[in-house]
């Protein structure tokens, strides 16, 4: 199962101090892939660390006011580039944690419903990446996918709509339990 956390601070110079404070609460397991993302000089920056790679460098986050870190075991045959979070699309970073029954089937169904350019962006085997693309589709539907000033209420409404769509697709694939993701 994935682990995710995001850190927001008022001063990018303080981000490493803040990361040191939470480090013990977010153990990076040796068999997991780790991804770190943030924004530096207005650009999305991202780094991935494969299974068995030293994760000490993961804590050396970019000079950013916002940092997102995700960790999860890598499945058999999965590649680090297509399977590790956070996922990136243009200026967006996205990560999800939790579990989803029949994740591969849900991923495939979600991907079928996406606009072609977003479906092409879903390269990996994870349902989380398809969920991200579905969220981007929600933003696109209201003409805000490129909006750097997207307000939190609109972002939350699109995320809620995305979660509802995932729940509906899960039901169509025969999942009887509610998705357990955050």
What is each residue range found by the language model?
Residues 44-45, 141-161:
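Extended, highly charged
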Residues 2, 93-102:
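Conserved beta-strand-loop-short alpha-helix elements that form
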Residues 99-107, 123:
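Acidic, low-complexity central loop/insert segments
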Residues 50-58, 69-90, 107-117:
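Short acidic (Asp/Glu) patches
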Residues 1-52:
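Extreme N-terminus nucleophile/cap motif
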Residues 151-182:
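Catalytic core of PPM/PP2C metal-dependent serine/threonine phosphatase domains
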Residues 38-69, 148-151:
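Short, compositionally biased leader-like segments
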Residues 111-140:
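Long, charge-dense
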């Amino acid at each position: 199962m994935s682990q995710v956390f995001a850190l927001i601070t008022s001063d990018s110079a303080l981000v490493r101090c803040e990361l040191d404070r939470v480090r013990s609460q977010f153990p990076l397991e040796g068999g997991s892939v780790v991804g770190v993302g943030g924004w530096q000089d207005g650009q999305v920056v991202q780094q991935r660390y494969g299974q068995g790679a030293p994760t000490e460098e993961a804590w050396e986050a970019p000079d950013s006011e916002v940092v997102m870190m995700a960790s999860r075991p890598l499945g058999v045959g999965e590649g680090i580039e297509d399977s590790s979070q956070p996922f990136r699309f243009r200026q967006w970073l996205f990560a999800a944690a939790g579990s989803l029954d029949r994740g591969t089937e849900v991923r495939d169904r979600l991907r079928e419903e996406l606009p072609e350019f977003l479906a092409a962006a879903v390269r990996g085997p994870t349902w989380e990446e398809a969920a991200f693309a579905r969220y981007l589709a929600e933003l696109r539907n209201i003409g805000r996918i490129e909006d750097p000033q997207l307000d939190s209420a609109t972002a939350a409404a699109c995320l809620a709509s995305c979660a509802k769509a995932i729940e509906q697709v899960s039901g169509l694939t025969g999942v009887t339990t509610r998705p357990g993701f955050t």
